């Protein structure tokens, strides 16, 4: 089930496949309550949650007001907490569950105008590690993926020049595509990764290795 605030149907079509899409605000508790109800009604159980929503508004500290700070943390971090509040109890009933939370390799970089974004994505790592301890006894794993900047609708606002500045630092000299991230996500949701939890998996074309 694909959840989006704006046009989930368009995103589902862009991704392809047979995804069911619903509209909800994942930065609010009410949004996740709606998602959980729809999952119960449609599937009868919840096994896997991938927290992939995020915003990337750039602003230097002089231009960064509290509203933008809070909006960034609400979408990029609060949503991960809310997903756990609604779906951990459902997964616990089945003694099995997988959370994959998307952070960013930007947390290890120095980039102007992204202090709020980096704070939110670093927070994801801390939350993943803490939650993994809480839910591990119930057969639930929690991991994070730190991707490079990726060619998705969410990065359309990033200039080609800025994108190139990132990927030129990588060992693999190109922009990441969604397909590059799908494989690691699928692995972390599988039984093959049942002994991995609380981990931050970097999928960034080798940027950390060479910088």
Task: Name what the model sees in each region.
Residues 60-61, 68-73, 155, 166:
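Substrate-binding pocket helix/loop in short-chain dehydrogenase/reductase
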Residues 1-43, 57, 68:
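Short-chain dehydrogenase/reductase
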Residues 109, 186, 197-211:
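Short C-terminal tail/terminal secondary-structure segment
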Residues 136, 141, 196-198:
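Short, small/polar-rich loop/turn modules that mediate ligand/substrate recognition or access, typified
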Residues 89, 133-134, 194:
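Alpha-helical segment proximal to the catalytic Tyr-Lys
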Residues 170-181, 192:
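A conserved structural motif in NAD(P)-dependent oxidoreductases
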Residues 84, 120, 128:
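Active-site helix of classical SDR
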């Amino acid at each position: 089930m694909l959840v989006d605030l704006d046009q989930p149907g368009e995103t589902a079509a862009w991704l392809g496949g047979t995804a069911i899409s619903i509209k909800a605000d994942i930065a609010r508790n009410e949004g996740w309550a709606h998602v959980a109800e729809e999952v119960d009604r449609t599937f009868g159980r919840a096994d896997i949650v991938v927290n992939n929503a995020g915003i990337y508004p750039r602003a230097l500290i002089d231009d960064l007001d509290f509203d933008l700070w809070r909006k960034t943390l609400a979408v990029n971090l609060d949503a991960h907490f809310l997903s756990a509040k609604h779906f951990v109890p459902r997964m616990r009933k089945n003694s099995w569950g997988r959370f994959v939370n998307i952070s960013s390799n930007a947390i290890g970089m120095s980039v102007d105008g992204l202090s709020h974004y980096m704070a939110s994505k670093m927070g994801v790592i801390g939350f993943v590690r803490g939650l993994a301890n809480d839910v591990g006894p119930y057969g639930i794993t929690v991991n994070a993926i730190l991707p490079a900047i990726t060619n998705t609708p969410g990065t359309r606002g990033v200039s080609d020049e800025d994108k190139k500045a990132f990927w030129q630092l990588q060992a693999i000299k190109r922009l990441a595509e969604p397909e590059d991230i799908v494989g690691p996500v699928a692995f972390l949701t599988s039984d093959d990764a049942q002994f991995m939890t609380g981990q931050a998996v970097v999928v960034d074309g080798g940027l950390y290795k060479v910088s």
